[in-house]
Amino acid sequence: MVPVVALVGRPNVGKSTLFNRLTRTRDALVADFPGLTRDRKYGRAEIEGREFICIDTGGIDGTEDGVETRMAEQSLLAIEEADVVLFMVDARAGLMPADEAIAKHLRSREKPTFLVVNKTDGLDPDQAVVDFYSLGLGEIYPIAASHGRGVLSLLEHVLLPWMEDLAPQEEVDEDAEYWAQFEAEENGEEEEEDDFDPQSLPIKLAIVGRPNVGKSTLTNRILGEERVVVYDMPGTTRDSIYIPMERDGREYVLIDTAGVRKRGKITDAVEKFSVIKTLQAIEDANVVMLVIDAREGISDQDLSLLGFILNSGRSLVIVVNKWDGLSQEVKEQVKETLDFRLGFIDFARVHFISALHGSGVGNLFESVREAYDSSTRRVGTSMLTRIMTMAVEDHQPPLVRGRRVKLKYAHAGGYNPPIVVIHGNQVKDLPDSYKRYLMNYFRKSLDVMGSPIRIQFKEGENPYANKRNTLTPTQMRKRKRLMKHIKKNK
């Protein structure tokens, strides 16, 4: 599960500035749902290759007496769902009553909390933080988020050790594996069999979407049809529910972000939406089903979720629910709107269903299996290089400064999603249009459907670049004789 870091504190203490610092390697804004999350922002960040979700909870300006209400409205859910809390205060404003009330609440939650004193630039470090020791939160970390001072130390001494304890990184060098495979093929050696068999593992399927689109109805419809094995494995308070099931001889793990409830207790009015659960379910899934309400059409929230799914590289099946009862004219309008707003998602199957009545639900799993198979299929270096060569023969790369971009060979760089690494000269100068052409060519040639495909380019290195040739003693003697001969004949 992807770890979660929540930034809390009063307004204008610099939470958004630190949020942007932490998420600078990714798109800072992942989802912004006014009215549902009370202006909280969710972003993906990275420390030395370890990803985590960062939450900017917005300002809490309550007093000692009323802070609990304000916390419940804006930040309580984020704090409960977070693995660690960075509590930010303002060194220039000094200790405020709201700071004390927030600290009291955090101490009562027994959540790992680190006190970050911002805006310490231009102040005496010792004097700037001394008042905040009374909050009883242990060591203090002074920073100046706007200038980046102290942020690196915060990452190295707080977040990185905490993430290592929470989720130790597996010491697996996939690149070495791929290069070993490539060299073996180049030398004519037999390619070693990959021990990993994706067909032997259950497909993790996440059903996500906005509130009231029918996620729970669809979940229970799926579980109610040809159900073989169903039992709940509840995790912590912030975890989704994982439900193992079997369908048509294939094992699945259904990730329910809203929680599975008894059929009689399901009502759209009480279906709750947790952004964190949704984002974590997407990260943990192999295939994501995005459920859209046909009567409401595509919303900005749907597009935000789509953006996160694409950034995560997950396979995708789009489900348009509540299709029953619509007139033919309205159905045509809905399809036109989908084609217009989802034109950039040309690899995903779109299904029109009624979860309530079950129409179209049975066809979903064919697309789920297709998407999973496409994302996990193993393709050898020779095949990928052959496809790349055919693509170049059909449409050559453009000239760059009078020289043709040369693509040398291709190999697999990863799976789920499939990654093709292309080596060549001047590849950094390839225009985006040609990169899209290559991506579409590989997709068509490999018959990839339901899964995104990524193309990465690596520049060929000249081993003699910036190196001076060292002459041997014999070459030096020959050079001297040649120079004497040239001078003599001048």
Swiss-Prot record:
The keyword Membrane does not apply. GTP 1 binds at residues 9-16, 56-60, 118-121. The keyword Hydrolase does not apply. One of its GO terms (molecular function) is ribosome binding. GTPase that plays an essential role in the late steps of ribosome biogenesis. This is GTPase Der. Pfam families: KH_dom-like (PF14714), MMR_HSR1 (PF01926). Residues 3-166, 203-376 form the EngA-type G domain. HAMAP family: GTPase_Der. Keywords: GTP-binding, Nucleotide-binding, Repeat, Ribosome biogenesis. Associates with the 50S ribosomal subunit. Residues 377-461 form the KH-like domain. Belongs to the TRAFAC class TrmE-Era-EngA-EngB-Septin-like GTPase superfamily. EngA (Der) GTPase family. InterPro entries: G_ENGA (IPR031166), GTP-bd (IPR006073), GTPase_Der (IPR016484), KH_dom-like (IPR032859), KH_dom-like_a/b (IPR015946), P-loop_NTPase (IPR027417), Small_GTP-bd (IPR005225). GTP 2 binds at residues 209-216, 256-260, 321-324. SUPFAM superfamilies: P-loop containing nucleoside triphosphate hydrolases. One of its GO terms (biological process) is ribosome biogenesis.
